[in-house]
């Protein structure tokens, strides 16, 4: 959620338009004060050129998830970023000017904005236009690319499925070329016999081969279950800890179970995923670990989600402080899905930290409302006990003389954009 992505997403976008924006770029500081060049309603203090809409969407959705009513100017800023055709670019410094052909619109930011605005309510016109645009750029395989005209990828397809579900659409009914989004999604799933069996690939390589990608897997598991960035955890034992089960081409439910099994195994030893970057020392992958918690909890593997959740509670504070609103949002989503208290996440209050990165909310649960919210979380945690696109490393990507920092979510890129 997180939103968010991998270098593969950037490479795919470069193929189509020369260069592309990551779903999320790390904020150097979570300080709330905006510089003269940043809109007052925007969350985060980092350059929003590549992730403004993504981080704003995740921040607002995370606030809504924990009962916080965001500042009106923050919501208005997000809605005001929409282009006339319904799409969203990562950031428009002058939204009064119409989007032109040079606007770097993308499916990930658009889908994330839909999820946030649909949850907040009162923006049917905006979300309706955005969904219409998303349908117009759907590929014939049923999936979506990061930028229109590119090949479908698991992360983009997943975040759009979440957007469709958020507005009450049935993703399986959104068909292009006789294919639904789920047809595309299961096409990225590796067979159990393969290395990394059960996982999802970001997209096929040039020879059609699939390589396991934890970022894509976490996103795809949630999407295959018909959920979005702020997925709900499922109580009960679930099937997140079982092995991969082949039955020919899996249906979405089986693909989700297989993907969750892969993720559960990936975090079983250390409690976290690892970011493997060319030329860099392997480091914990905080963002994709947060997304993994969401995926395991949504699939029903609450027991498997507890180890990575506890690891995040113990180790993710510095990462979130540096990552800013999108990172805090990913942790809120993880806590929400796994039944933890986001106001006591390893001793820190994620909600207060998130709120501090932008304009003061209109309302925050206090007193009995806050206690009720906490009791609900504890109940979910007890029920399930029986059973964030950011990589720590940064990439320097050159395209048309432009370099920018990537953070991986899943993934995804791929906030892509949680």
Task: Report the location of each language-model feature.
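Preference for long, amphipathic alpha-helical scaffolds in soluble/luminal domains
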Residues: 2-418
């Amino acid at each position: 959620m997180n939103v968010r992505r991998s270098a593969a997403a950037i490479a795919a976008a470069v193929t189509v338009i020369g260069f592309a924006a990551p779903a999320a770029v790390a904020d150097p500081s979570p300080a709330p004060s905006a510089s003269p060049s940043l809109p007052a309603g925007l969350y985060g203090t980092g350059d929003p050129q590549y992730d403004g809409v993504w981080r704003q969407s995740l921040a607002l959705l995370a606030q809504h998830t924990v009962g916080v009513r965001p500042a009106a100017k923050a919501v208005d800023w997000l809605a005001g970023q929409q282009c006339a055709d319904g799409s969203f670019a990562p950031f428009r410094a002058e939204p009064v000017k119409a989007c032109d052909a040079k606007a770097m619109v993308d499916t990930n930011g658009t889908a994330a904005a839909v999820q946030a605005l649909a949850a907040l309510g009162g923006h049917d016109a905006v979300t309706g236009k955005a969904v219409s645009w998303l349908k117009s750029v759907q590929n014939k395989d049923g999936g979506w690319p990061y930028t229109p005209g590119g090949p479908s990828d698991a992360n983009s397809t997943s975040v759009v499925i979440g957007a469709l579900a958020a507005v009450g659409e049935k993703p399986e009914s959104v068909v292009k070329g006789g294919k639904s989004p789920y047809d595309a999604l299961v096409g990225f799933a590796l067979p159990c016999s393969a290395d990394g069996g059960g996982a999802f690939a970001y997209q096929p390589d040039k020879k059609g081969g699939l390589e396991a990608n934890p970022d894509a897997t976490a996103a795809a598991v949630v999407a295959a279950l018909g959920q979005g960035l702020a997925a709900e955890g499922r109580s009960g034992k679930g099937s997140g800890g079982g092995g991969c089960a082949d039955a020919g081409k899996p249906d979405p439910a089986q693909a989700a179970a297989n993907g969750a099994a892969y993720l559960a195994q990936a975090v079983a030893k250390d409690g976290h995923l690892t970011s493997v970057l060319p030329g860099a020392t392997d480091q914990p992958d905080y963002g994709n670990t947060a997304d993994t918690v969401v995926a395991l909890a949504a699939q029903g593997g609450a027991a498997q989600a507890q180890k990575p959740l506890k690891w995040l509670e113990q180790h993710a504070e510095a990462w979130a402080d540096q990552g800013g609103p999108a990172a805090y949002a990913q942790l809120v989503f993880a806590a929400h899905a796994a039944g933890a208290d986001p106001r006591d996440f390893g001793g820190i209050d994620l909600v207060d930290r998130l709120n501090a990165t932008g304009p003061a909310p209109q309302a925050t649960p206090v007193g009995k409302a806050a206690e009720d919210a906490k009791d609900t979380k504890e109940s979910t945690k007890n029920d399930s006990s029986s059973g964030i696109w950011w990589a720590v490393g940064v990439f320097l990507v050159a395209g048309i003389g432009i370099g920018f920092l990537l953070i991986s979510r899943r993934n995804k890129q791929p906030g892509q954009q949680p």
